[in-house]
Amino acid sequence: DAAYEPEMNVQDLLAVVDSIGAQQPILVGASMGGSTSLLAVGTGRLHAAAMVMVDIAPRIEPEGSDRIKAFMDQKPDGFDSLDEVADAIASYQPQRTRPRNLDGLAKNIRLGSDGKYHWHWDPRRRNRTWDMSEYRQSLERAADNLNLPVLLVRGGLSDVLTEEGAQSFLQQCPHAEYVNVTGAAHMVAGDRNDVFSGAVVDFLHRVVPPEG
């Protein structure tokens, strides 16, 4: 039904949590996943044990968001080859080395019956219908209500969440912890998964110790 409004994303998250029977889940969300978690928790509809927000906060940069949209809007009718896909990714993420072996791209795309390569996401999600100013205000309000352990992870090269945007969130949520991953852009885990994973595991072991 192509319902990708922020509120529908929250409803989807609540449904997933309910389906697995998690009483107090640990939420780790990057970009849209992080903002969805923030809205769900900050509005009191989901009680989580801890939350990790990856390169997202209420104050993000429009230019960075526009770059993501431009990347997603490329080749709406599909890519002709894996090389063309790799070129698009390399243009969007110049900090990464373009892979010589393109077999790994197969998990990020699908080969359609038309012989073209398409992203896994629904192309209809590009048709944003909600008001971004109102959306960001709702994130601001949600951030004021956080009382659970929170870790904010920022990619040091990110043009979506700047250092100023991160510090603004930390002022709103002073008990939150913060990690700046140098050498990583918006796709933090993809750029520096070693540092990212280590920071998340360390945080969770401290704030939500494993049972037994």
Predicted regions and their residues:
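Glycine-rich phosphate-binding loop signature in dinucleotide/nucleotide-binding domains
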Residues: I20-Q23, F203, V207
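Catalytic histidine-centered segment of alpha/beta-hydrolase-like enzymes
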Residues: V181-S197
